[in-house]
Amino acid sequence: MWEFVKQTDPEIYEVIMKEWERQEYGLELIASENFVSPAVMEAMGSVLTNKYAEGYPKKRYYGGCEWVDVAENLARERAKKLFNAKYANVQPHSGSQANMGAYFALAEPGSTLMGMSLSHGGHLTHGASVNFSGQIYKVVQYGVNPQTETIDYDEVRKLALEHKPKIIVAGGSAYSRIIDFKKFREIADEVGAYLVVDMAHFAGLVAAGIYPNPLEYAHVVTSTTHKTLRGPRGGLILTNDEEIYKAINKAIFPGIQGGPLMHVIAAKAVCFKEALSDEFKAYQNQIVKNAKALAKALENRGLRIVSGGTDTHLMLVDLNPLNVTGKAAETALGYCHITVNKNTIPNETRSPFVASGIRLGTPALTTRGMKEEQMEEIADLIVTVLKNVKDEEGNVDEEVAKRVSDRVIELCKQFPLYVGKI
């Protein structure tokens, strides 16, 4: 594979090979990352990348779309079946653009949008001041209860009654507990707001029936297709309301996008087909088992898990008990072939560029075939590194780094990723 790249552009070929090596021989614990199947990868690298297809199936602005229409219809129908939805738009290039399309379909610029604070586990597109959502809309942010570190629904209701938002956004990027969508819908109805649920992180769990389906209550559901869904990098919008669906379609095209990425849409179709299988349901169940096992193992080794545990694929780890910052931990673990990301925690006292926590997730480890037994060992490796961080630059004792790195590589060889497959 990649022989033509090797001949044409040796520099990029080297980048691809080095990145393959990093993925193959490293433990990936970033909660938003996963590894696609060879089938998804092949679809993304197909001749479909050559086709312009502005518009929607049977309503294109270009000729020659008869086969890409089939691909997009397959993606839409499979997404609808997977999430029990009446309508699906599979064209958003990303989760951020899925959210933008949903917001533009439901509310005029200057309207009030209420979302979860980024520092409490939300996402940039839920109203962060540096994001389009915080610049185009008036934003009200809710957070977690400082004692329980779970969503404070009383605060959500109080803020909604006070500010009367046009859109309420539920979902997050670093929230490990199951969200009560029924409560959110009741609050939205009370103030006349639309409820948008961003399920980007837990979409795979929803598809497998492990996490409640937000479409039972939300006016609109958005998602990415990577993360727990294990598909290509892209976005998805679902709704059961025909008029909202029409508005979403206009908001995506011609509103914020031109031509859709047909090779990615085909890969989404492959991903949705994989997600409809019994094997995928078993995989999602194992993700949650692994997350619970990893959280418990870290807790048993002296670390604090925000909110006391996890119901999903991810956890937020408070590093204050070890007096290590998220920045130093991310760097130190990276030296040892363990990839994580620094993350703020509720009641954060440090800058987001330094942070007091790390966010961990188990989808990528589970894709390799790892189970609870490996989570115990990985917790050991993580804590060994964290206890040997020398400074804020994340330097680690060389002997410790080599010992951990060697074991990580051994583990990865026991549970290979793409070796022999691509």
Swiss-Prot record:
Function: Catalyzes the reversible interconversion of serine and glycine with tetrahydrofolate (THF) serving as the one-carbon carrier. This reaction serves as the major source of one-carbon groups required for the biosynthesis of purines, thymidylate, methionine, and other important biomolecules. Also exhibits THF-independent aldolase activity toward beta-hydroxyamino acids, producing glycine and aldehydes, via a retro-aldol mechanism.
InterPro entries, sorted: PyrdxlP-dep_Trfase, PyrdxlP-dep_Trfase_major, PyrdxlP-dep_Trfase_small, Ser_HO-MeTrfase, Ser_HO-MeTrfase-like, Ser_HO-MeTrfase_PLP_BS, SHMT-like_dom
Subcellular location per the Swiss-Prot or TrEMBL entry: Cytoplasm
Protein name per the record: Serine hydroxymethyltransferase
Subunit structure, as described in the record: Homodimer.
Modified positions (N6-(pyridoxal phosphate)lysine) in chain numbering: 227
Domain of life: Bacteria
CDD domains with a match to the protein in the record: SHMT
Membership in a protein family: Belongs to the SHMT family.
GO molecular function, one term: glycine hydroxymethyltransferase activity
Site features described as Plays an important role in substrate specificity, chain residue numbers: 226
Any Gene Ontology biological process: tetrahydrofolate interconversion
Cited NCBIfam families: PRK00011.1
Origin organism lineage: Bacteria, Thermotogati, Thermotogota, Thermotogae, Thermotogales
Cofactors that this protein relies on: pyridoxal 5'-phosphate
GO cellular component, one term: cytosol
Keyword Ribonucleoprotein in annotation: no
EC number: 2.1.2.1
